[in-house]
Protein backbone atom coordinates (compact mmCIF):
# COMPACT_ATOMS: atom_id res chain seq x y z
CA UNK A 1 0.00 0.00 0.00
CA UNK A 2 0.88 3.69 0.23
CA UNK A 3 3.52 3.92 2.95
CA UNK A 4 4.25 7.64 2.51
CA UNK A 5 2.95 8.36 6.01
CA UNK A 6 2.51 4.85 7.36
CA UNK A 7 2.66 3.72 10.97
CA UNK A 8 2.84 0.34 12.68
CA UNK A 9 1.64 -1.31 15.90
CA UNK A 10 2.41 -4.81 17.13
CA UNK A 11 0.62 -7.76 18.67
CA UNK A 12 1.35 -8.54 22.31
CA UNK A 13 3.70 -11.40 21.35
CA UNK A 14 5.51 -9.16 18.82
CA UNK A 15 4.80 -11.65 16.03
CA UNK A 16 2.33 -9.60 14.00
CA UNK A 17 2.67 -6.07 12.66
CA UNK A 18 -0.40 -4.03 11.76
CA UNK A 19 0.48 -1.47 9.11
CA UNK A 20 -1.71 1.58 8.53
CA UNK A 21 -1.24 2.89 4.98
CA UNK A 22 -2.12 6.33 3.73
CA UNK A 23 -4.32 4.72 1.07
CA UNK A 24 -6.71 3.41 3.74
CA UNK A 25 -5.16 -0.04 3.76
CA UNK A 26 -4.80 -2.05 6.97
CA UNK A 27 -2.33 -4.89 6.58
CA UNK A 28 -1.48 -7.65 9.06
CA UNK A 29 2.02 -9.04 8.54
CA UNK A 30 3.38 -12.24 10.09
CA UNK A 31 6.96 -11.28 10.97
CA UNK A 32 8.04 -14.89 11.57
CA UNK A 33 6.75 -16.14 8.23
CA UNK A 34 7.55 -12.94 6.37
CA UNK A 35 4.16 -12.80 4.69
CA UNK A 36 0.85 -10.94 4.73
CA UNK A 37 -1.73 -12.66 6.92
CA UNK A 38 -4.66 -10.38 6.11
CA UNK A 39 -5.37 -7.08 4.40
CA UNK A 40 -8.33 -4.78 3.94
CA UNK A 41 -8.87 -1.40 2.28
CA UNK A 42 -11.03 0.16 4.96
CA UNK A 43 -11.17 3.82 3.84
CA UNK A 44 -9.97 6.25 1.21
CA UNK A 45 -7.35 7.97 3.35
CA UNK A 46 -6.12 6.97 6.81
CA UNK A 47 -3.59 8.52 9.16
CA UNK A 48 -2.60 5.93 11.76
CA UNK A 49 -3.99 3.50 14.27
CA UNK A 50 -3.71 1.78 17.62
CA UNK A 51 -4.05 -1.63 19.22
CA UNK A 52 -6.20 -2.20 22.30
CA UNK A 53 -4.89 -2.88 25.78
CA UNK A 54 -5.69 -6.59 25.50
CA UNK A 55 -4.35 -6.82 21.95
CA UNK A 56 -7.63 -8.12 20.51
CA UNK A 57 -8.74 -5.01 18.64
CA UNK A 58 -7.05 -2.75 16.09
CA UNK A 59 -8.42 0.74 15.44
CA UNK A 60 -7.74 3.00 12.44
CA UNK A 61 -8.20 6.77 12.25
CA UNK A 62 -9.46 8.04 8.91
CA UNK A 63 -9.38 11.31 7.01
CA UNK A 64 -11.77 10.19 4.29
CA UNK A 65 -14.42 9.39 5.19
CA UNK A 66 -13.70 10.88 8.61
CA UNK A 67 -14.06 8.48 11.50
CA UNK A 68 -12.61 5.48 13.30
CA UNK A 69 -13.01 1.83 12.36
CA UNK A 70 -12.20 -0.97 14.78
CA UNK A 71 -11.26 -4.48 13.66
CA UNK A 72 -10.73 -7.91 15.17
CA UNK A 73 -6.95 -8.29 15.48
CA UNK A 74 -7.03 -11.95 14.40
CA UNK A 75 -9.22 -11.74 11.32
CA UNK A 76 -9.39 -8.00 10.49
CA UNK A 77 -13.17 -8.30 10.42
CA UNK A 78 -14.96 -5.04 11.19
CA UNK A 79 -16.13 -4.79 14.81
CA UNK A 80 -17.22 -1.14 15.05
CA UNK A 81 -17.60 1.83 12.69
CA UNK A 82 -17.60 5.26 14.37
CA UNK A 83 -18.25 8.10 11.89
CA UNK A 84 -16.84 11.44 13.10
CA UNK A 85 -20.07 13.35 12.51
CA UNK A 86 -20.35 16.79 14.09
CA UNK A 87 -22.47 19.94 13.92
CA UNK A 88 -26.02 20.25 12.68
CA UNK A 89 -25.37 19.42 9.03
CA UNK A 90 -23.98 15.92 9.40
CA UNK A 91 -20.47 16.88 8.35
CA UNK A 92 -17.63 14.43 8.96
CA UNK A 93 -14.32 15.46 10.46
CA UNK A 94 -10.83 14.17 9.81
CA UNK A 95 -9.64 12.10 12.77
CA UNK A 96 -6.13 12.41 14.18
CA UNK A 97 -4.24 11.52 17.35
CA UNK A 98 -5.71 8.04 17.84
CA UNK A 99 -4.17 6.21 20.81
CA UNK A 100 -4.96 3.25 23.02
CA UNK A 101 -5.54 3.86 26.73
CA UNK A 102 -5.96 1.62 29.78
CA UNK A 103 -9.39 0.09 30.27
CA UNK A 104 -9.91 -0.93 26.63
CA UNK A 105 -10.23 2.69 25.58
CA UNK A 106 -9.39 4.39 22.32
CA UNK A 107 -8.99 8.19 22.39
CA UNK A 108 -8.86 10.45 19.34
CA UNK A 109 -9.32 14.04 18.16
CA UNK A 110 -11.45 15.60 15.43
CA UNK A 111 -9.51 18.15 13.34
CA UNK A 112 -12.49 19.94 11.81
CA UNK A 113 -14.78 19.78 14.83
CA UNK A 114 -12.33 20.70 17.59
CA UNK A 115 -13.39 17.76 19.74
CA UNK A 116 -11.89 14.80 21.65
CA UNK A 117 -13.79 11.50 21.69
CA UNK A 118 -13.30 8.40 23.82
CA UNK A 119 -14.69 5.00 22.88
CA UNK A 120 -14.82 2.27 25.53
CA UNK A 121 -14.50 -1.16 23.90
CA UNK A 122 -14.79 -3.23 27.08
CA UNK A 123 -17.87 -4.75 25.47
CA UNK A 124 -16.95 -4.89 21.79
CA UNK A 125 -20.56 -5.60 20.86
CA UNK A 126 -21.68 -2.34 22.47
CA UNK A 127 -19.07 0.45 22.20
CA UNK A 128 -19.61 3.37 24.59
CA UNK A 129 -18.77 6.79 23.16
CA UNK A 130 -18.04 9.96 25.12
CA UNK A 131 -17.47 13.34 23.46
CA UNK A 132 -15.67 16.46 24.67
CA UNK A 133 -16.50 19.51 22.57
CA UNK A 134 -14.97 22.97 22.20
CA UNK A 135 -11.42 21.87 22.96
CA UNK A 136 -9.83 24.40 20.56
CA UNK A 137 -9.27 24.93 16.85
CA UNK A 138 -7.79 22.24 14.64
CA UNK A 139 -6.16 19.66 16.90
CA UNK A 140 -3.36 18.44 14.61
CA UNK A 141 -1.82 15.63 16.65
CA UNK A 142 -2.05 14.18 20.12
CA UNK A 143 -0.23 12.03 22.62
CA UNK A 144 -0.86 10.02 25.71
CA UNK A 145 1.61 10.13 28.59
CA UNK A 146 3.59 6.93 29.19
CA UNK A 147 1.47 6.08 32.25
CA UNK A 148 -1.72 6.34 30.19
CA UNK A 149 -3.23 9.11 32.30
CA UNK A 150 -3.13 12.32 30.26
CA UNK A 151 -4.22 12.77 26.65
CA UNK A 152 -2.94 16.02 25.15
CA UNK A 153 -3.85 17.48 21.77
CA UNK A 154 -1.78 20.14 20.06
CA UNK A 155 -3.77 22.95 18.44
CA UNK A 156 -2.88 24.32 15.02
CA UNK A 157 -5.65 26.91 14.82
CA UNK A 158 -4.66 28.71 18.02
CA UNK A 159 -2.00 28.79 20.70
CA UNK A 160 -1.97 26.32 23.55
CA UNK A 161 -2.89 22.67 24.02
CA UNK A 162 -5.93 20.73 25.19
CA UNK A 163 -5.47 18.20 28.00
CA UNK A 164 -7.83 15.47 29.19
CA UNK A 165 -7.18 13.64 32.47
CA UNK A 166 -8.40 10.09 31.81
CA UNK A 167 -8.50 9.40 35.55
CA UNK A 168 -10.91 12.31 36.08
CA UNK A 169 -13.07 12.60 33.00
CA UNK A 170 -15.71 14.56 34.90
CA UNK A 171 -13.27 17.49 35.01
CA UNK A 172 -13.46 17.78 31.24
CA UNK A 173 -10.82 19.19 28.92
CA UNK A 174 -8.37 21.68 30.39
CA UNK A 175 -6.53 24.23 28.28
CA UNK A 176 -2.84 24.37 29.07
CA UNK A 177 -0.30 26.96 27.92
CA UNK A 178 -3.12 29.16 26.53
CA UNK A 179 -0.89 32.21 26.11
CA UNK A 180 2.03 30.49 24.45
CA UNK A 181 3.08 32.44 21.37
CA UNK A 182 0.95 35.52 22.02
CA UNK A 183 2.40 38.58 20.37
CA UNK A 184 5.04 36.59 18.50
CA UNK A 185 5.45 36.52 14.75
CA UNK A 186 4.89 32.97 13.58
CA UNK A 187 7.02 31.35 10.91
CA UNK A 188 5.64 29.36 7.97
CA UNK A 189 5.08 25.75 9.04
CA UNK A 190 7.10 23.48 6.73
CA UNK A 191 6.24 20.19 8.44
CA UNK A 192 3.66 19.52 11.12
CA UNK A 193 5.44 18.39 14.29
CA UNK A 194 4.57 15.06 15.85
CA UNK A 195 3.53 14.82 19.47
CA UNK A 196 3.67 11.02 19.64
CA UNK A 197 7.38 11.14 20.32
CA UNK A 198 7.29 13.83 22.97
CA UNK A 199 9.89 13.44 25.65
CA UNK A 200 9.27 12.90 29.36
CA UNK A 201 12.16 13.28 31.79
CA UNK A 202 11.21 13.28 35.46
CA UNK A 203 8.57 15.98 35.94
CA UNK A 204 9.38 17.72 32.67
CA UNK A 205 7.93 17.21 29.22
CA UNK A 206 9.60 18.41 26.02
CA UNK A 207 7.39 19.15 23.01
CA UNK A 208 7.94 20.73 19.58
CA UNK A 209 6.60 24.26 19.16
CA UNK A 210 4.54 24.71 15.99
CA UNK A 211 6.10 27.13 13.53
CA UNK A 212 8.95 28.12 15.84
CA UNK A 213 12.60 27.20 16.27
CA UNK A 214 11.93 26.11 19.83
CA UNK A 215 11.35 23.11 22.04
CA UNK A 216 8.83 23.85 24.75
CA UNK A 217 9.48 22.58 28.30
CA UNK A 218 6.42 21.83 30.44
CA UNK A 219 6.25 21.19 34.18
CA UNK A 220 4.00 18.13 34.38
CA UNK A 221 3.03 18.81 37.99
CA UNK A 222 1.49 22.19 37.21
CA UNK A 223 1.13 21.91 33.40
CA UNK A 224 2.73 25.31 33.07
CA UNK A 225 5.57 26.42 30.85
CA UNK A 226 8.96 25.78 32.47
CA UNK A 227 11.19 27.01 29.67
CA UNK A 228 11.92 27.27 25.97
CA UNK A 229 14.98 25.93 24.23
CA UNK A 230 16.16 27.59 21.02
CA UNK A 231 16.98 24.94 18.45
CA UNK A 232 18.38 24.65 14.93
CA UNK A 233 15.08 24.74 13.04
CA UNK A 234 11.41 23.83 13.29
CA UNK A 235 11.33 20.63 15.37
CA UNK A 236 9.36 17.64 14.10
CA UNK A 237 10.10 14.85 16.59
CA UNK A 238 11.31 15.50 20.14
CA UNK A 239 12.19 12.10 21.57
CA UNK A 240 13.68 11.07 24.90
CA UNK A 241 16.26 8.37 25.35
CA UNK A 242 14.52 5.66 27.41
CA UNK A 243 16.26 6.77 30.62
CA UNK A 244 15.15 10.38 30.07
CA UNK A 245 18.68 11.77 30.36
CA UNK A 246 18.85 13.19 26.85
CA UNK A 247 16.33 14.40 24.28
CA UNK A 248 16.99 14.06 20.55
CA UNK A 249 15.38 16.48 18.08
CA UNK A 250 15.03 16.40 14.30
CA UNK A 251 13.79 19.20 12.06
CA UNK A 252 11.65 20.18 9.09
CA UNK A 253 13.08 21.36 5.77
CA UNK A 254 15.38 23.10 5.08
CA UNK A 255 17.12 21.94 8.27
CA UNK A 256 16.28 18.24 8.06
CA UNK A 257 19.90 17.12 7.77
CA UNK A 258 20.53 17.90 11.43
CA UNK A 259 19.95 16.30 14.84
CA UNK A 260 20.39 18.12 18.14
CA UNK A 261 20.71 16.51 21.57
CA UNK A 262 19.39 18.31 24.67
CA UNK A 263 20.57 17.60 28.21
CA UNK A 264 17.40 17.36 30.32
CA UNK A 265 19.08 18.61 33.50
CA UNK A 266 20.78 21.73 32.17
CA UNK A 267 18.34 22.23 29.25
CA UNK A 268 21.36 22.94 27.07
CA UNK A 269 22.12 21.55 23.62
CA UNK A 270 25.12 19.30 24.12
CA UNK A 271 25.56 17.79 20.66
CA UNK A 272 24.73 18.54 17.05
CA UNK A 273 24.95 15.85 14.38
CA UNK A 274 24.48 15.96 10.61
CA UNK A 275 23.61 12.38 9.56
CA UNK A 276 22.47 13.44 6.08
CA UNK A 277 19.63 15.00 4.12
CA UNK A 278 16.09 14.09 5.04
CA UNK A 279 16.31 12.75 8.60
CA UNK A 280 12.66 11.80 9.06
CA UNK A 281 12.42 9.54 12.09
CA UNK A 282 14.28 8.27 15.15
CA UNK A 283 13.83 5.14 17.23
CA UNK A 284 15.78 4.18 20.36
CA UNK A 285 16.75 0.66 21.30
CA UNK A 286 14.55 -0.38 24.27
CA UNK A 287 17.39 0.22 26.77
CA UNK A 288 18.63 3.30 24.97
CA UNK A 289 22.17 2.36 24.00
CA UNK A 290 21.55 3.05 20.31
CA UNK A 291 19.32 5.24 18.20
CA UNK A 292 18.34 4.44 14.60
CA UNK A 293 17.76 7.30 12.15
CA UNK A 294 16.10 7.19 8.75
CA UNK A 295 17.92 9.39 6.21
CA UNK A 296 15.41 9.34 3.38
CA UNK A 297 17.05 11.58 0.81
CA UNK A 298 20.30 9.59 0.95
CA UNK A 299 18.66 6.14 1.10
CA UNK A 300 20.25 5.11 4.38
CA UNK A 301 19.46 4.09 7.95
CA UNK A 302 22.10 5.28 10.42
CA UNK A 303 22.79 3.80 13.86
CA UNK A 304 24.41 5.98 16.52
CA UNK A 305 25.83 5.21 19.95
CA UNK A 306 23.85 7.43 22.35
CA UNK A 307 26.72 7.76 24.83
CA UNK A 308 29.60 8.62 22.53
CA UNK A 309 27.40 10.05 19.73
CA UNK A 310 29.52 8.15 17.24
CA UNK A 311 28.06 6.46 14.20
CA UNK A 312 28.15 2.69 14.64
CA UNK A 313 26.67 1.49 11.37
CA UNK A 314 25.01 2.55 8.15
CA UNK A 315 22.58 0.41 6.17
CA UNK A 316 21.29 1.03 2.65
CA UNK A 317 17.50 1.40 2.47
CA UNK A 318 15.26 2.73 -0.27
CA UNK A 319 13.64 5.99 0.89
CA UNK A 320 13.34 4.97 4.58
CA UNK A 321 10.78 6.77 6.70
CA UNK A 322 9.29 5.48 9.96
CA UNK A 323 11.29 3.11 12.18
CA UNK A 324 9.22 0.96 14.54
CA UNK A 325 10.81 -1.61 16.87
CA UNK A 326 8.66 -4.49 18.12
CA UNK A 327 9.29 -3.39 21.74
CA UNK A 328 6.48 -0.89 21.10
CA UNK A 329 4.11 -3.81 21.71
CA UNK A 330 4.57 -3.29 25.45
CA UNK A 331 4.11 0.48 25.67
CA UNK A 332 0.89 2.45 26.09
CA UNK A 333 0.02 4.67 23.15
CA UNK A 334 2.46 3.05 20.73
Question: What are these model-derived regions, one by one?
Answer:
Residues 1-334:
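Predominantly soluble domains enriched in secretory-pathway, periplasmic, or organellar proteins
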